């Protein structure tokens, strides 16, 4: 009986050790991909899934296409890409991928599997020659390019013309700076021009309408906006260097969803994406936050030393939800993390390497009274 009693204590101890670890990760288990798996570089600025199902990762040193098994790299050194520092990715209606870099814009042709420099001149005789901050598109097939040192460029595939927007005659931005630009499902353009307000345009930037009164009390004055994301119930979600905000566009109110971490420091929100209508994922400099809009519950996931299933790095720069319901997360130091769509309700239970455990093998299970 003494042997059975000791065995029971051993099993309880092992499972206690396992479940303490499982609780730290809130039941979320990620698969990591980095340079050891074939990724060109561990800093991932941009992610997209193309129409064929391939995943694309824009890194600090090359563009990678992933088929679920292996990577194909497009790099300057191999002659398949003109510049390696990728800043933004966008797939147009024809399946071409527009690639923003720190020195201009490139276009990938899925038919020929080649990348070409976009060298067209605009109506002001300016080309896209500097850092591209953002590439996106409208519902009419137009391509919009936000640059760091130049104005906004609009490319019309129907007319094959490039036009400068929001610029003076020299092609420079006619106001301070432009941050985020996003077209919603109604083809309304939302943007941030770094003056504390948000704006929208229903005529492709011919006119900009402020969301809030321009009375000196704009809610984002002094803030640096990193991400704009329209959501359900006529709300806009704004990621800033001091947290995550929800803007109710109906009554023009702002609600703070995330502001301080457990140490009291500001939460630097770089990226936000919807996992579902009720669940918002925020990539920050201090880990991944999952905010439930219905319950207002927050889950904070961080890298855990010795845990191969935790996120590989706390600095999150990009998030993409694929068509299968999985989430791909790009980090600054740890490559890509993948969280598959959950079809079962089983929790992953495993030991931590740094804990002095009495055993790692489970021989049998026994149901409790619940």
Where are these regions (language model features)?
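Carboxylate-rich, polar loop motifs that coordinate divalent cations or form catalytic acidic clusters
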Residues: 1-370
